[in-house]
């Protein structure tokens, strides 16, 4: 997988507040271009020896493969689950315009350099003085 490959990351959270926290953290930090929040999903799973049946919210995160680890880390920091689900899927086909938009939205802005760029200039000789002779050899 190339670092500029489009991926979709899927995760689930227990509350709308957590969903918004994850979504805003990812988009603000430019780790994701877009996060869809799908409310009212129902998950049935086995955890610590028992079958659980919970309401959750599903997040669909659009980003680049190069951002996967940062997305995973953000989800683990914000999500309150002991073992958050973080699944990444490569997207095999997408419209070129959408892919270009994802690349722009996840690119970190270029830093502006304070002040002017320094350029080399020839040293000027003091008025009325001759330049020192060059040594040969």
Q: Could you tell me what each predicted segment is?
A:
Residues 1-125, 129-137:
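Positively charged, small/polar-rich N-terminal and surface patches that mediate targeting and assembly
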């Amino acid at each position: 997988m190339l670092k500029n490959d489009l991926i979709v990351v899927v995760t689930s959270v227990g509350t709308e507040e957590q969903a918004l926290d994850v979504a805003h953290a990812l988009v603000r930090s430019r780790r994701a271009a877009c996060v869809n929040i799908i409310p009212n999903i129902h998950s049935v799973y086995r955890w610590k020896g028992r079958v659980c049946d919970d309401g959750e919210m599903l997040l669909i995160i659009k980003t680049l493969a190069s951002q996967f680890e940062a997305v995973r880390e953000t989800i683990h920091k914000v999500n309150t689950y002991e073992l958050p689900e973080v699944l990444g899927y490569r997207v095999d086909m997408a419209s070129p315009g959408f892919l270009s938009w994802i690349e722009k939205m996840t690119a970190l802005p270029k830093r502006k350099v304070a002040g002017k760029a320094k350029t080399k200039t020839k040293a000027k000789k003091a008025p009325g003085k001759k330049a020192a002779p060059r040594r040969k050899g």
